[in-house]
Amino acid sequence: NETIGGVEFPYIPDVGDVPLVADFSSAYLSRPLDVSRFGVVYGGAQKNLGPAGLAVVLVRDDLLDRARPDVPAIWDWRTMAANDSMLNTPPTFSIYLLGLIMEWMEEQGGLEAIGAANEAKARSLYEAIDSSDFYANPVEPRSRSWMNIPFTLADPALDADFLAGAADAGLVNLKGHRSVGGMRASIYNAM
């Protein structure tokens, strides 16, 4: 998932024997995903898992011994794995919050239910955008993100008024990324 442009792969690429590496910051626990097809999956917790300051990294066992000798111990996955991810003092409060979020997700019905809710949120928003002449989404439907939905108005001069009206209705932080403008709705699990 790429958050600025609101695109994501609609499939897991087949890369043969080459280890596939992915940043799952926005996709972690958004729906069931087959992580066994990846060599490395990493991501910050701040989108779907918890507060900023915590990273979740999954490394396939056969890749642990491939670190270069000049890699500092803190970034050497082999060393981290040998120390049960406790080479340094872990961010305990962030891990505690991650645990609470995992409990909440189970209470919602688990990953299948979270995925169904996220798909419904995204579908509803895309349908509203696509059925209107007032809004536009630049991403081809097959490559659209479930988590980050960029859109523009037919008249960009209305952007400021739209954002103010949205804020009055309780919809905040919709301003698009500075590099692309427009609007962007981030609809992570907690939304």
Where is each model-derived feature located?
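Conserved PLP-binding catalytic core of the aspartate aminotransferase-like
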Residues: Y135-A166
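Active-site phosphate-binding strand-loop segment of PLP-dependent enzymes
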Residues: N1-Y28
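Conserved hydrophobic/aromatic beta-strand scaffold that supports enzyme active sites
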Residues: V40-Y42, L54-L58, N148-P150
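Active-site C-terminal subdomain of aminotransferase-like
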Residues: A45-E127, E140
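Conserved PLP-binding active-site segment of the aspartate aminotransferase-like
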Residues: I149-D155, L171-M191
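Conserved active-site segment immediately N-terminal to the catalytic lysine
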Residues: V21, V35-Q46
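A short secondary-structure junction signal
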Residues: G5-Y11, S30-S36, A52-A55, A67-D70
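Solvent-exposed alpha-helices and their adjacent loops that cap or buttress functional pockets
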Residues: Y11-V15, P32-S36, K47-P51, P141-R142, ...
